Amino acid sequence: MVGTFYRAPSPESPNYADVGTEVGPETVVCIIEAMKVMNEIKAEARGIVTQALVENGKPVEFGQPLFKIRPL
């Protein structure tokens, strides 16, 4: 396990990226917590989020896809 996947900065905050959200290379889409450090993860491509592939609070591995993004 690399870390824990979080869709929002806190439980009370809205998700960084939901289905239908337009994202680009500078858009933060989630946070991965590793060793008590919160790492902002940015989209790797420009497009529209079509699916979140990981549930909030679940462990993730290096290289694991987190979202499906339809290119614009």
Role assignments for model-derived ranges:
Residues 1-72:
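Structured functional modules or segments
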